[in-house]
Swiss-Prot record:
Membrane-topology annotation of the record: Multi-pass membrane protein
Note: Partially overlaps UIP4.
Compartment list: Membrane
Protein name: Putative uncharacterized protein YPL185W
Species of origin: Saccharomyces cerevisiae (strain ATCC 204508 / S288c)
GO CC terms in record: membrane
Organism classification: Eukaryota, Fungi, Dikarya, Ascomycota, Saccharomycotina
Keywords recorded for this protein, A-Z: Membrane, Transmembrane, Transmembrane helix
Length: 131
């Protein structure tokens, strides 16, 4: 489904559609993109290449994981402030909230494949009628 969406609408719209985070910037595997300024195709290719590298050394192993289990890489797509050098109290609180958001996304990304496994074990026996 994600692959069809990417083919039809392109990478940029896919990223804006799947990850609509309200923040000044999006931090994604070492790349910071300002909101409102879409990254170029070359930047996106670098990001996806780096993402594949983190999920597995072999492209053929990593691509099915990325397409079939999006929760495995949602945890790495975290919005952060572009300028966190200011020492005001509000920005420190915002940074703490973002760190908490990071932890929640990591927890969801780790648990979701297990939930999918449990769900598959529960529903697959009922989907096939016994002879």
């Amino acid at each position: 489904m994600y692959l069809i969406f990417i083919i039809m609408f392109g990478y940029r719209r896919f990223i804006k559609f799947v990850f609509p985070f309200p923040a000044t910037g999006i931090y994604f595997h070492g790349y910071t993109f300002p909101i409102g300024k879409l990254p170029s195709d070359l930047q996106l290719w670098k990001v996806f290449r780096r993402m594949i590298k983190y999920n597995g050394d072999h492209y053929l192993v990593a691509l099915p994981i990325l397409m079939l289990q999006p929760s495995m890489y949602v945890c790495t797509y975290v919005c952060k402030e572009v300028d966190i050098e200011k020492e005001s109290r509000g920005e420190r609180e915002r940074t703490k909230k973002l760190k908490l958001f990071e932890i929640v996304l990591y927890y969801l990304s780790v648990c979701t494949p297990y939930w999918w496994n449990i769900t598959a074990k529960f529903f697959i026996p009922f989907s096939h009628s016994s002879p």
